[in-house]
Amino acid sequence: MAVLNLGTYPPKQCGIATFSMDLRNSLLIHGNEVKVMAVSEEKNKYEYPPEVVFEIDRQHRPDYFAAASFINSAADVELVIIQHEYGIFGGMDGEYIMDLVGMLLKPYVLVTHTVLPNPTRSCKNILNYLAGRASAVVSMTRNSMMLMSDLYEAPPELIYLIAHGVPEFKVQ
């Protein structure tokens, strides 16, 4: 399957960037083609590897519309994986990601890294919006699965538990 992962990505140093790289490596092992759309604090801040095919300046709202157009016109993208954490995307509480999703014509899987038990109205609305349009929602804990269903109104049949895990490494 041809997949595009949307989130932060190395050389940015953050947990989701590392998660995105590890997920890509795992998907490649299983025969998938995986491209990356990286979200940065500003364009051209990082020298990304060749798998990064598009860069979003997180606070530049037009980039989200351009990103959706890029995905929609990419014949070699069948599925989008969106790594969601409120601090990744621009606007109040990361609201700009809704612009991209609102234009997206391809199916996407929403991976929830933070599911707040007592969200602000804005945070709740954003996650409701994203989950309500997703083909699947990935939660990393049973508690976040319940919150996604009960509080964020994601359809229970679309929520999957995939524990975070760790990458393989040699113990010395």
PLM segments and residue spans:
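Short N-terminal targeting/anchoring amphipathic segment
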Residues: 54-58, 69-94, 109-111
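Conserved alpha-helical elements of sugar-nucleotide-dependent glycosyltransferases
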Residues: 16-26, 96, 126
